[in-house]
């Protein structure tokens, strides 16, 4: 299931992405520093994996980190002695089961470096450059806005999933669920992907909030807690919708069982009605010579009347028992 109008950015895989450097001030101000060791301000950098391999030492983070963006499978953060390193694997909101937006990052108290060959991180930061102004500029607030930018449209997307599931449930109740159950399976799979994504973001925000390396000011740790709360809310909403899909599947199965029960009831009634008639037919089909009633002129209509009476009696009995 796709919600194209809520896809964050155009996909530019394979395009050459320029390296970008920003100073965290009242706004994110693009800069071209040569020495990151003696900066008097915190910074944000977005570079390619090739640039990281060639010049990672200029960021003075004290790490030897070989990252292969093609091997990224999840979102997580690792605590090192002099830095934090991690990866992002973000499902596309246009098609959650399709290719993901994968990039890596490394940060210390001086700033953060995103390693991104696709350009997703750069485009998100470009939106922040155009829309954000900071009263108290700091790395923590930038990280809050960056993480919030990843999820800020997700509430609307989840509302659309909810509305679609409501429609599928209505179709099931109206006995018009052709094609809907297959779509329900797709939605369930997409919700599972989102739920896993949110769980990983929750772990990442908690790790940042713990501030094991004391890179962040204690007063600013609240930004990561705010991110955690927002992502937790989304995680709970997707879990609730996943349960809703299970409810709809059970409801659809119940509808199928009801149809089958009705068919079996009809077959049982037909069998029960015709069983005594079959017995009578078989009785008189034995062709014994000495069957005195066969010589009576009223025998034939009497047998017909008896058969009709038996059939009516059976139908009345089933009706009284509410089997019909």
Question: Language model features by range: what are they?
Answer:
Residues 98-179:
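Switch/coupling subdomain of P-loop NTPase systems
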């Amino acid at each position: 299931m796709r919600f194209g109008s809520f896809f964050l950015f155009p996909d530019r895989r394979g395009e050459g992405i320029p390296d970008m450097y920003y100073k965290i001030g009242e706004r994110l101000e693009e800069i071209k520093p040569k020495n990151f060791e003696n900066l008097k301000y915190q910074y944000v950098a977005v570079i390619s994996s090739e640039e990281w391999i060639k010049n990672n030492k200029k960021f003075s983070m004290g790490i030897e980190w070989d990252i292969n963006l093609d091997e990224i499978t999840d979102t997580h953060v690792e605590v090192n002695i002099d830095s934090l390193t991690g990866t992002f694997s973000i499902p596309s909101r246009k098609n959650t089961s399709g290719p993901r937006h994968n990039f890596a990052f490394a940060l210390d108290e001086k700033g953060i470096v995103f390693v991104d060959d696709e350009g997703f991180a750069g485009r998100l930061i470009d939106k922040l450059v155009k829309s954000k102004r900071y009263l108290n500029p700091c790395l923590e607030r930038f990280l809050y806005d960056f993480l919030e930018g990843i999820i800020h449209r997700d509430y609307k997307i989840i509302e659309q999933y909810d509305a679609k599931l409501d429609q599928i449930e209505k179709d099931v109740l109206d006995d018009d669920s052709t094609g809907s159950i297959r779509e329900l399976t797709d939605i369930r799979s997409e919700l599972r992907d989102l739920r896993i994504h949110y769980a990983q973001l929750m772990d990442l925000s908690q790790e940042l909030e713990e501030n094991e390396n004391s890179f962040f000011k204690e007063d600013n740790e609240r930004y990561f807690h705010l991110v955690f709360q927002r992502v937790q809310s989304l995680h709970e909403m997707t879990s609730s919708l996943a349960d809703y899909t299970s409810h709809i599947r059970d409801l659809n199965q119940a509808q199928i069982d009801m149809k089958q029960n009705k068919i079996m009831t009809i077959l049982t009634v037909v069998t029960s009605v015709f069983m005594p008639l079959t017995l009578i037919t078989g009785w008189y089909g034995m062709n014994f010579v000495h069957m005195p009633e066969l010589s009576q002129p009223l025998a034939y209509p009497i047998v017909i009347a008896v058969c009709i009476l038996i059939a009516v009696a059976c139908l009345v009995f089933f009706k009284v028992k509410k089997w019909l």
